[in-house]
Each structure stands twice: as structure tokens, then as C-alpha cells.
Amino acid sequence: MPLLFAGSVFADPDPASGIHVPKDFKIERIYEVPGGQGSWVAITKDDKGRFICSDQYGGLYRVEAGAAPKVEKLEVKISGAHGLLWFQGVLYVSINEAPMKSGVWMVKPQGDQFSEPVLVKEFKGRGEHGPHQMVPSPDGQWIYVTCGNFTDLPGMDGYQPAKVWQEDQLLTRCTDPRGHDPNQMAPGGWIARFKPDGGSWELYASGFRNTYDIAFNDRGDLFGYDSDMEWDFGTPWYRPTRLCEILPGGEYGWRNGSGKWPVEYEDNYGSLVDFGPGSPTGVVAGRGAKFPEAYQRALYTLDWTFATVRAIHLEPQGTSYKATSEEFITGTGLPFTDAVIGDDGAMYLLTGGRKTGSAMWKVTYTGSASTAPVKIGREADPLAAFKSAIDKPTPAAINSLWEKLGSSERTERFLARTALEKLPPASWAPRLDAEKDAWRVIGASIGLARVSTKEDRARALSALDRLDWSKLSSLQRINWLRACDLEFIRGGEPQVEERQKVLAKIDKSFPTGDEMVDRELCRLLCYLQAPGIVGRTLTAMDLAGPGKPPAWTEIAARNSGYGKPILEMLKNLPPAQVLHYVYCLRAVKGPWGAGERERFFSWVDRLASGSGGASYGGFVAELRKQALANATPEERVRFEKPAHAAANPMANLPPVKGPGKDWTVDEVAALAAGGLSGRDKENGRNMFKASLCAACHAFNGEGGDVGPDLTTLGGRFKPRDIADAIINPSAVVSDQFAYSTITRKDGSSLFGRMLKEENGKVIVGTNPFDTTQTVEVPKDEITSMERSSISPMPGALINRLNPDELKDLLAFLTGAK
């Protein structure tokens, strides 16, 4: 017997107050999810216009949205879904957080309920970077599914990209010093497609970090909303959350740690618009909405952290688009998770996730502008020529691909190169011998490095050498250098003559004054141990100036939800150019010239005192360590100790008055319900320190970096949610902060965070308050390593506080007035 729930009665008369939407739009909360129904993260619409929603850690619920929504718990053996799709009379489910096998499941209707779920494709990957959402293709022939970078790529029946992905790092990468993803390698996050019957699986694109959702626009092109690694903030390899057009065979350049590829590299495809920090969740097309034309054609991206829904307006531009971002919904306490367009033309959204309070919202247009359905689709498929060339590689088709290698449009160059990579090199590589066009030479050389043998290396390097460096554009120079990088990465270190030719071409150019060209010149010249590169780079560091705001700053500055640390960092960014030069110079072996080590480590110490994301300081420390490894013994002795010692987070803690008690979630929620306005936030700040919160968590730029930054906590969580997280920290443990239980052959075990692997050993951080305290475990002594469901955070940290002190702490955390 299914359970039915009537629409909740709201305690507050206008739950939409304080939420901003464009003129003539209206947002209303239509259902507040009771605690017993969990926290909803995915939504789809069935063929009767009803909604099916999933609890992140529980089952499925069906909602009939009306004046009083009816909610029914479905009798189906499914739980832990991150993705739902109703298509052609079948429910497809992407399982992520359950005891069930991770992967895509198919559930067919049986009356008004469902039959036994059938596993379509099993994945190895769970959690917030596991398998996510699905979307059907406009022609109904395929279903696309997106998976985060903690989801191993399973075997496929076909591959849109050539199976040639590698890490492609010219210089040794720095893995994340906090141990987030040291063993997650290419292809990273990926998107696949399959037939509605569950067969014919194809890898479609890869190189993402954690694209949670995807959608087709009104012209039938695919887009995804990829995540950032917020701990990288302040480094040159930080990549903001971004909207990407997903091309068949696309590579998007995510690699772990410092290894993320610059967006300028032609061997990956860039983004359409960068948003800055955030937590991407849902993406939905406006198709079918009773909105004005511009909003029907828009894509909508949902940001969980900063309570924002953006409308992305796409203007066709050549073979791609120009994207404009508009804030469509903003507010506080709105952790958006997913959205869908209903049969009534309204947009329905979910808020929730991580066991927070959850709700369903409805957005309608109330103005007088026309809401007539717009024409969708396009007259011709711009990818048709590329597809036919791969299917039927006639000489004429290969001629066409070769011509497009020289296109002024990046999309055409990318698609032409990836198409050629799927064909035998012998069918196109000889054309390089007489080629003079810069883009064709560069693109073909990149392609040959990725797919060919050493026989074609000489051909590619010779063609690159024929180009006139002085006549290349900035982007062409960057990719001329990248082509050389790939030849040496894939084909081995350069021979003496090869090294001499490359140095003769580029050495005197550095520095050029072009920031991105100089980054890539420095990378290759340091790899080649170019004469005098240390002195020239140190001078470039001295002249680099302060950090420059990134291109996405304007978009980020409009978001009032951003906390003080981000806003302050945008005003005073660390000099990413200098940090990149440090990254390169660490590879240059000693001895260096007189005074050069002093200048270098002086810069490293200055960088160490700067601000950045949670991993920023650890990256600087690791660069120092690796630079010392390439120094002479005498230099190591002199510079092994940094000028700035880390502060002790446990020192000088403020006193607590007490008396405390064993607080429960209900007691804390009731305390907060009595009101937090007018509280002593300065004392709340002191209680944040006294309760050891600041030892692990930052708030407004102050505190530790072991746990998540809590600055925007009040914008996402209610006091009850905050109380639950403090008192029951193991209820939800994010992938980013989870510890592992490591069992040795002798039966002993170790609890800690795996930071990295090196020299046959696993480096494990064992102190949650200090990631520098580590234990080395030989890899061959480990029998198992399993993610623990136990949080490293203790569960009674507020029990020393009296009611007034606890209210001050809650007011501080929530930003109560």
C-alpha cells in the first residue's frame, strides 16, 4: 500500500520572501519535504505530468503538483539515486549512494507502480563524484549519462574519442596536498550515451572534473556544468565552475592536482562561460516553459553552494556560441539540486542534498510578453561532415578534414583533429611534409604526438621548425609549444639535435611580455634546462606585479552570496604568474648562479604568506620541497627551513564560561527558534575558536583548512541542519573530507586520509588538525583500503557551551542580524 502525504503546512507565511527573480516572474514553495522523506536531489516528469523525485540517501517519491500537492512514496526497490529520467515509458535511474550496485538501472511500470529494477550498466564509483544525471537526445535515439571523476570508465561498445588519453604532463605534477584525488587519472569525469533499450554504450566525451548534469539546447547541442576544485583557488591551475559545450570526442583537460590543462591548449576544448567558485548541480533547458522567447531558449544552471540559478543565453557564433549569464534566481538557504519543466509550462525546482531541509519550488511567468512555443532544432547538422569522414574516410573526406585543421574557428580545428586521430596516421600524416599553414602544422603535430609512433616525431618536429615563430599569434605560439611538449611527453626526452633546434627557435624570446605565452615558454625552457633560464625567470617574477583578476570576476562579484574570503581574494589575488614560475623553476637542477636561490626562496616564502584555497599553502610547501630536491646538498642545508612557521591552531583558545550539557539536535533547534537577532557575534567568533571549530574550518578567511569552509553556511543550512552536522558529524561525510581505514598484512589498521603515493609507499595523514603529520605505509603491506563512514570530526564539540554561548555561536555561523 503506497504511503500518501498531503502538502505540508508552512510555519512561515511567505517562504519566497527574500528570493529574487526577474521582473514578471514568480517563485513559490509548493512543498516542504518532511524529515522522514529525506533530502531530494533529482527530479523527472512521467508521461502523466507527475514528478518523480529521489532522496539522496533513500527512496523515490511521486508528486502530483496542485493546490495541495500529493506525495506518494513509490514501492520500488531503488534508493540513493543521483539521476532520474522518464523516457519512452521507462524510468532510468542513476544509482550512486546506496547498497545497490552503482550504475544505470532501468525500471518499467507495472500498473501504477514499478517492476523489479534491472541493472543496465554497472559503474565502479560512488559518492558526490560518482554517476549523476541523464538526458535523452533530441531525436530520441540515445540517452546520455554524466559521471564524475571518481567513476572509473567501464568497457564501452564504442568510443567517440580515440582511445589515446594520457596525463600529458611535461613537468612533474603536484598532487593535491590534502590527498583529495591523487589516484584519479585520465580520462577523469566522462559522458557516455546508450540506446533506450540499454545497449550500444559509447564514450562521448571526457576530461571533466564533476559535471553533475547536462542538457540539450533548442538547437540540439549538448552542454554541461562542470565543477571547480575550490581548494586550488589562488593557483594558476584553478579552473572555475563553467558551462561547456560538449562535442563528440571532446576532451576537457581535467587532471588531478596541479595537472589541469590550460584552456588555451588545443588538445582540450574550452568553456563557453566561467562562473567562478560554486557547486554545480542541475542543468535544464527552457524548452516547453511558458516563458518569453529568450527564457525558452535559455539553459538554466543550478548552484548548490551559492543559492543561485543562472539563465544562460546562447547566441550562435560560427560553429559554436557566445554565452551570456543572467542571475535568474538568487536567495539564501536555497541549496538547489535539480529542476524540470512541467506540463503546465512552469519550472519546478528542488532544494536539498546532504540531508539538509528540502523543498519543491515553482517558477511561473506572470507578465504580458508572448509565451508562444519557439521553433526548435536546426536545418542542418554542422557535425555531419566530420561524422561522414570518420565513417567513410575517402580521399575527399580526408582533404576536407585537413582543410578544417586550418580553420579560424577552434571548434572546427578541434573536431577535424579528433576525427583524423581516429583514422590511420598513414592516411594523413604525409600531408604535413609540405604544409605551411600554421594551424594545420600545429594541429597535425598535436594529433601525431597523441596517436603515432616515433617515426612521425621527426616529421612533426621538422614541420614545427619550419614555422616562423615571429609571425605566430599568441594562441598559435602557446600551441606550438604544446605540440613540442607532447612530442617529448609521449615520445621521450629530446635528442641533442632536437633540443638544440627547439632552443634556437624559442630561447631568446623569453620573456615576451605575453603572460600566457611566457608561462608555456618557461615550462618548456625549464624542462630543457635552457642556459640562463633561472635568472631570466627570476627577473620576470620581480616584474610580474600583483595578481590579476580572472575574466569571471565580474560574474562572481554580482553574487552577493559569496563570502568574505572570496571577495577579499578577488581584491588581492596571489600572483598566479609568479607561482607558475616557481612551479617551473623547481625542475631546474642546481647549482644555480650566485644569489639565485636566495631570490627564489624569498619569493616562495612570500607566496606562503599569501591567501588562497584550502590547498594553496600545501601546494607552495610542496613546490619548496621539490625545488630543494633538485638543489645541491649545500643549498638544501641552507634553505630547508621556511621563513614562516605554521601557526598552532590550538594555542591561546578563548575561555568558555559554561556550564555546558550534552546538547541534542532538537534542543539546539529549539534554542535557535527562539531568535538569534541581536546576539553577540564577537563572542560567537570566540566560541567558534573555543569549540575547536577554527582548528579545522575557516570562516571569513580565519581558521583552518582541514575541513570545509563555513563562511556561506547560513546561506545553505537551517539551524537544525547545522546542529545535526555538529552533533552527528558522521551522518554525512563528503568525499572531499572522508578518511579511510587501511588494513595491513599483519592485521593492524590505520585510520587517516590518503594524501598521495610515492616510491612504493602510501602517505597517510593521521591528525585531523594537522595534515603535515603523516605515516608512510609500504604499498605491498596493505591488504585493503576502504573509505570510512566515520567522520574525523568529534561529535561533542559544543557540549562545553551554555545556552547563551551556543546562541552566539549560531548567530555567528548563520549571519543573523
What does each model-identified segment do?
Residues T305, V340-G345, G353, E409-T411, ...:
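C-terminal substrate/ligand-recognition segments
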